[in-house]
Regions:
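Hydrophobic faces of well-ordered beta-strands that scaffold small-molecule active sites
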Residues: 9-11, 59-61, 152, 181-183, ...
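Substrate-binding/active-site clefts of carbohydrate-active enzymes
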Residues: 3-147, 165-175, 180, 191-192, ...
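Short, flexible loop/turn elements at secondary-structure junctions
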Residues: 15, 36-39, 65, 158, ...
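Active-site-proximal helices and loops of the catalytic beta/alpha 8
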Residues: 49, 67, 72-76, 139-141, ...
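Short catalytic-loop micro-motif centered on adjacent basic/acidic residues
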Residues: 60, 151-157, 267-268
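Short, basic, glycine/proline-bearing loop/turn elements
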Residues: 30-34, 259-270
Length: 335
């Protein structure tokens, strides 16, 4: 990675996910202080960070503040009755993130978004509980200090309590001013994403200390625009229309621009496996404003053609496993 010019490594959550199925996802954490034993130990993770640093590569840790896994040891004896939202009973989130910024939204609509659960196996944590809020803040600070992290990626950022996010981001940036933190706010509306960036000062007075967010709008525009005919609102105009809204961001140059990620179809697949368009997308990504992020396997044209199954999208990198016909580390079997 260092030879290819990468300066940071972002791993999906490496903490314990003690579940009977789909544990490869990593987002249903069952112990916030322990690396999943299938990966190794806390010490081996810290050594990985140190080894990467010696090569000029920093480590970005994927953190989950909104929910945990239903197999977390908390579930056996909750610290308090309000540790989870909705009386610890599954009530699905609406995923309508816009309600948090909508001046016309009903309070119940906002609550259903932020207090609802993703799925029944991911209890939604109540950060309005001061003990839980302190726990999550201290846990984040501990991992930065213990492992020597250079950055944090926060999953499902806007789903957590807004007041808590203000305090969490304040504490993190106060303690580590040079630590970059990127939040996941999956919206194709730049204004919705910009609400969370430090310095935005929206009309409702919300204060955020979050330095960076993922630019989902630009990724979507590239994936669609490069394969479309030019029209009033299609083709390359999609990309222009997104960039033309940069004024809503306090710092568009600190947004993370990305080719694709583990939650969506790979760009190579989305572009019909056309190498010319894929190269064009990468060239744009690496030269436009923002911090570029590339998913593993992009360099060997990994694809999920014909399926949106996340297990396929997140397939193992070829090589290093017994029986692999292709080895992308050595070049064996590659076309």
């Amino acid at each position: 990675l260092a030879v290819m010019g990468y300066t940071q490594l972002w791993l999906n959550p490496v903490l314990a996910n003690n579940h009977p199925d789909v544990t490869y996802r990593g987002y249903a954490i069952t112990d916030f202080y322990q690396v999943d034993p299938r990966f190794g130990t806390n010490e081996s993770f810290r050594q990985l960070v140190a080894d990467a640093r010696q090569r000029g590569v920093g480590m970005i840790m994927d953190m989950v503040l909104n929910h945990c896994g239903s197999q977390h040891w908390w579930m056996q004896d909750l610290p308090s009755r309000d540790w989870f939202n909705n009386d610890s009973q599954f009530v699905a989130t609406t995923h309508v993130r816009e309600t948090l910024q909508d001046t016309h939204a009903a309070a119940d609509d906002r609550r259903l978004f932020s207090d609802g659960w993703f799925v029944a196996t991911m209890p939604d944590m109540n950060q309005r509980n001061p003990h839980l809020a302190t726990y999550l803040i201290q846990n984040s600070l501990w991992w930065v200090e213990y492992a020597g992290l250079s950055g944090i990626r926060v999953d499902t950022y806007s789903y957590s309590d807004r007041a808590f996010l203000t305090e969490w981001s304040r504490r993190m940036t106060q303690e580590y001013p040079n630590l970059n933190i990127v939040g996941e706010e999956w919206s194709s509306n730049p204004s919705t994403v910009a609400y969370w960036q430090r310095g935005r000062n929206p009309p409702d007075g919300y204060v955020s200390y979050l330095p960076s967010l993922f630019d989902f709008a630009l990724q979507e525009a590239v994936a669609m625009g490069l394969k479309e005919a030019e029209g009033w609102g299609t083709g390359l105009r999609r990309i222009y229309k997104v960039l033309a809204q940069d004024s809503v961001f306090p710092d568009p140059y600190n947004l993370v621009v990305f080719h694709d990620n583990h939650d969506m179809s790979r760009m190579f697949t989305a572009l019909g496996e056309r190498q010319d368009l894929n190269r064009m997308a990468l060239a744009f990504l690496l030269t436009t404003r923002g911090i570029p992020q590339i998913l593993y396997g992009t360099e060997v044209l990994m694809s999920n053609k014909g399926t949106e199954d996340h297990g396929i999208i997140r397939s193992d990198f070829p090589g290093g496993w017994a029986g692999d016909a292709k080895n992308a580390f050595t070049g064996q079997g590659l076309s």
